[in-house]
């Protein structure tokens, strides 16, 4: 409902190459989270949507980005907490199209849902 108050395009699909932002309630290892991180997309807390909707406009993303604040009592290491911010900044600085740019990888796995997920992840993150 809150997204409808703001000018945006909501992508609900297995393909999300054109995504610019991902809203995540918590850090996780999902395909979408990993792909967004490796592609240098903004990964933001749900408060970004809530506060932007209350303001009636999109707010600056910086303070809502995962990795902006590192929690000491988190089940996730500081490296994991800071990964979205670090990768976004690194890819912006270097101009690389993704975290795995120029990697050549062979996946020796059976074809199933999990392999489909890895293939989509490689497509999104500049993996060859």
Task: Describe the residue ranges of each PLM region.
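The feature marks the first
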Residues: 1-13, 17-22
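Short, conserved beta-strand segments within well-ordered enzyme catalytic domains
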Residues: 23, 42-44
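Phospho-regulatory, Ser/Thr- and acidic-rich intrinsically disordered linkers and terminal tails
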Residues: 1-8, 31-34, 38-39, 46-128
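Short, well-ordered secondary-structure micro-motifs within conserved domains or adaptor modules
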Residues: 16-29, 128
